[in-house]
Amino acid sequence: MQALLPIEQYDSLLAEKQKKLTALLAPFHAPALAVFPSPVQHYRMRAEFRIWHDKGDFYHIMFDQRTRQRYRVDCFPMASQLINQMMDTLLPLLKTNRVLHHKLFQIDYLSTLSNKIIVSLLYHKTLDEEWEQAAKQLKASLLQQGFDLQLIGRASKQKICLEQEFVDEVLTVHGKSYVYRQVENSFTQPNAIVNQKMLEWAVDCTQNSEGDLLELYCGNGNFSIALAQNFRKVLATEIAKPSVAAAQFNIAENSIKNLQIIRMSAEEFTQAMNGVREFHRLKGIDLNAYECNTIFVDPPRAGLDEETVKLVQNYDRILYISCNPHTLCDNLQHLCQTHRIEKAALFDQFPYTEHMEAGVWLIRK
């Protein structure tokens, strides 16, 4: 079964999102939205499928979000062309080897614009030497067919990487290329084309900035790497170890000299800035050496907690990317007491869904 996309409805669906976000931001006197559309198909760079075993056959399935009924997926138009090519090639190879398909229950795909892909095979069994040998043969066969891939096996408390657990993406921001290491099973922006547009918008907002930038929740450095060119120094926080390691690689790979990553949560950083407690992880970093008058936040769906909102209000300029406009508006109730919205944007990261990615650029009143 092919999960068809209503491509002919794309423009009207995006217009509806624009209308909704405009209405949500209206109480805060936001200017007209800049709207950044997505490609209408092949826009998702990652996908996860359950595997359904049926009378000696097996295939990718997904579950209908409303009915929870499973349905077969032989191709997936919202995923990148590379993922579709891999889906088409991989399953026939798995079917020829019982060691590889026995108790296989899920396959995860992570692809890049740089034409690399990670395939993760998830099992309800312990992976042994026999599995590893079969997996090496599978990888060799896929390499022979022209795929640039990493193959990973996962089971309970077990992970086998045949080579490495990451791929290096290349994103272009206003004509300049940046390398981003993306680690399997870690967060990456799902829509790479729209991500590039988000980065360009953020760079444009912060052009001609003075002083330093603080970023909370930096992930693999997606934004801070591109924004570093606009600031004297950048200080960024992230809690997940794999993301911090990827960010450190990205800093070195892109020759960014003015960006420092520290591994702590936004809440912990707030405590450090307010002098509530000291952190060993900040040893050797002089927070007083930073003159951060701009802050960038890209929080989880829950938005910023109350203490972080207070921290953010201390900065003259606030760049806020949100994956949940409702919690963004909750935060704006407080932020707009001290700041005004200079620019606002809608990024269509998730076409054909109700999800909206929003950006606001706030300046102190």
UniProtKB/Swiss-Prot annotation:
Name of the molecule in the record: tRNA/tmRNA (uracil-C(5))-methyltransferase
One annotated GO molecular function: tRNA binding
Example of a GO biological process term: tRNA methylation
Entry-linked InterPro entries: MeTrfase_TrmA_AS (IPR030390), MeTrfase_TrmA_CS (IPR030391), SAM-dependent_MTases_sf (IPR029063), TrmA_MeTrfase (IPR011869), U5_MeTrfase_fam (IPR010280)
Function: Dual-specificity methyltransferase that catalyzes the formation of 5-methyluridine at position 54 (m5U54) in all tRNAs, and that of position 341 (m5U341) in tmRNA (transfer-mRNA).
Any Gene Ontology CC annotation: cytosol
Family: Belongs to the class I-like SAM-binding methyltransferase superfamily. RNA M5U methyltransferase family. TrmA subfamily.
Active site: C323 (nucleophile), E357 (proton acceptor)
